[in-house]
């Protein structure tokens, strides 16, 4: 009983000391939003102002018959949730 308690304490101390700050922190979840792009600069500015993220314009190929809505340039904004 005494040895198992000592072993448990040593394992706990090892786990705490092996982590950077003693606290395990998970990564932030990534989210995104998109809207019709009005230019790269406006896209970046709006994304930063509204979401504190990184925005970029995506210029798709000409529309297909299946997805004509994809013709418009789209501002894609990626940010931490």
Swiss-Prot record:
InterPro entries: DEFL (IPR010851). One of its GO terms (biological process) is killing of cells of another organism. It is found in: Secreted. Residues 1-19 form the signal peptide. Keywords: Antimicrobial, Disulfide bond, Fungicide, Plant defense, Secreted, Signal. Its main location: secreted. Pfam families: AtDEF-like. Disulfide bonds join 31-81, 37-57, 43-75, 47-77. One of its GO terms (cellular component) is extracellular region. Belongs to the DEFL family. This is Putative defensin-like protein 188. It comes from Arabidopsis thaliana.
